[in-house]
A protein has these predicted regions:
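Short proline/glycine-enriched turn/loop segments at secondary-structure junctions
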Residues: 256-262, 275-277
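Short conserved micro-motifs at the rims of enzyme active sites and ligand-binding pockets
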Residues: 51-53, 90-92, 187-191, 229-234, ...
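A short pocket-lining beta-strand/turn micro-motif at the edge of beta-sheets
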Residues: 172, 216, 250, 263-267
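Active-site scaffold segments
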Residues: 99-101, 266-271
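Hydrophobic, well-ordered secondary-structure elements that form the walls
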Residues: 176-179, 220, 269
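C-terminal hydrophobic structural anchor segments
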Residues: 213-256
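Intrinsically disordered, low-complexity terminal tails
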Residues: 1-4, 287-293
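Acidic/polar, low-complexity extended loops/arms that serve as protein-protein interfaces
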Residues: 1-173, 187, 193-214, 220-221, ...
Length: 293
């Protein structure tokens, strides 16, 4: 039929699952469904607790909160398929739309979830990291080298400083997100005993092509949207992504249009997914940045 409709819950669930599988950030972030735009309280610092004596006063907590607006940015994918393809190949139209739309929307969202500037797009993981007063802790290393890391421009000590700059309470469950190029160079770094920082996982040691290993004991994820090494670039983030939250507003909508491209015997399908995202606790993330020169 020609017109827009909200997909059934079963299809919606499969679309969200496909998005999660196709998006690096979505696969590790917290996700929440919300029916409308809203303001949410963001905790700027964890409160403290102390033992008090009987009859003693309880001092005020140092926890502070701000409010951030959660909007809904409309991600749309237009899929065009020939009737011959759908008819002759016996393709399940529902599966075809889910796969194609999910992959297209996931690519767009993954880019914005990484470096979105909160202006017409979600607030990315690294938004504010390059500000004069960074919103998240930044460890600087290197000399702007765009090809490799050496003892002259990036040492094991700097990588250790970066990882351990994340407060200990957030390290459990934390992961590293970086680019393939940076990972290659991080894997070449050795400690003074000659051991690589990168260690293969037990399964990878047993089976070729096993799951990825770790950097300093922490899992890593590769995103094509992380910058390669260059001056003043954020090239990796280590953090607890339970504190990066994706808000999906409402259900996915699909418009099936068999008429606009009827002269070429094609069907158009437009899929719309509304989402926003932001860091809910800045101190749960630390960035690794190439120096200016």
């Amino acid at each position: 039929a020609n017109g827009g409709f909200t997909v059934p819950e079963t299809v919606e669930g499969r679309i969200v699952e496909k998005l999660r599988q196709s998006s690096v950030i979505r696969s590790i972030a917290r996700t929440t469904s919300t029916p409308d735009d809203r303001k949410i309280p963001i905790q700027n610092a964890i409160p403290t607790a102390a033992i008090i004596g009987e009859g003693s006063s309880i001092t005020a907590s140092d926890a502070t909160f701000t409010q951030l607006s959660v909007d809904s940015y409309k991600y749309a994918a237009r899929i065009v398929a020939s009737r011959e393809l759908l008819d002759d190949s016996g393709i399940n139209l529902e599966e075809y739309v889910i796969r194609m739309a999910s992959e297209a929307i996931a690519r767009a969202q993954d880019e914005h979830f990484w470096d979105g500037d909160d202006s017409g797009k979600p607030k990315g993981v690294i938004d504010g990291a390059l500000a004069g007063t960074p919103e998240i802790t930044v460890t600087q290393f290197g000399t702007g080298n765009t090809t490799s890391l050496t003892s002259a421009d990036a040492t094991v000590d700097k990588v250790l400083d970066w990882v351990y700059s994340l407060p200990v309470q957030y390290r459990m469950g934390s992961v590293i997100v970086t680019s393939d190029q940076v990972l290659k160079n991080l894997r070449k770094l050795r400690n003074t005993a000659g051991d690589y920082l990168w260690q293969a996982s037990p399964v990878e040691r047993m089976l070729a092509g096993g799951p990825a290993g770790t950097i300093l004991g922490y899992p890593y994820y590769i995103s094509e949207y992380v910058d390669a090494m260059a001056a003043n670039k954020i090239v990796a983030v280590f953090g607890n992504f339970n504190y990066y939250e994706i808000f999906d507003r409402g259900a996915t909508e699909i418009l099936v249009d068999p008429y606009s491209s009827a002269s070429t015997w094609q069907i158009q399908m437009i899929v719309v997914k509304r989402s926003d995202a932001l860091r809910t606790l800045d101190e749960a993330f630390v960035a690794l940045k190439c120096s200016a020169s």
